[in-house]
Amino acid sequence: MSIAQTKRFTLDEYHRLGELGFFHEDDHIELINGEIIEMASKGTVHETCLRNLWKQLPKIVGDRATLQSQAPITLPPKSEPEPDFAIVQNRDDNYLSSHPKPTDVLLVMEVSDSSLAYDQDVKIPLYAQAGITDYWIFNLFDNYLEAYSKPYQDNQGRYGYSNKRIFLSDEIITFPCFPDLSLDLAKVFPPKRNF
């Protein structure tokens, strides 16, 4: 009996597929651990949270860093996620020559409803292994922010974050990369709805 194996792509192969037209601009995909993953569609609560973040984040971050949304971050050797938001260091070429790498990333943010388990079970070890120091999940099921920091590797080789803090939707959180800046979560989380 033969066993089917999944084809895992390198970053170069993934980029080449894009150059050859295998993907369309409206495809919502990302490369995670060598696999091409179709991202979940976004519901109205998810989109509302994204819009609220778009209203708040540019005003707060200003010119101190670069804010990107649903744009690639290159995590060699086989991942290129497109988080809902990332705050990355400013660069003279504004990332024209390459996507941000882990050393450029100050904070990654995901808005999670139907993707919550994936953002916790897959993205946490992915970002921790890459050395992303801070990762926030706007958890729309429980209506709170999960703030992860201090990436580590355990004795079995698994990656994660040693620090997890919960911030309720009416709290204010400071940015780890800019401790003098804060985000009022009441302006971000939509009113609680049952899913």
Which residues does each PLM region occupy?
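Gly/Pro/Ser/Thr-rich low-complexity, intrinsically disordered segments predominantly at protein N-termini
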Residues: 1-195
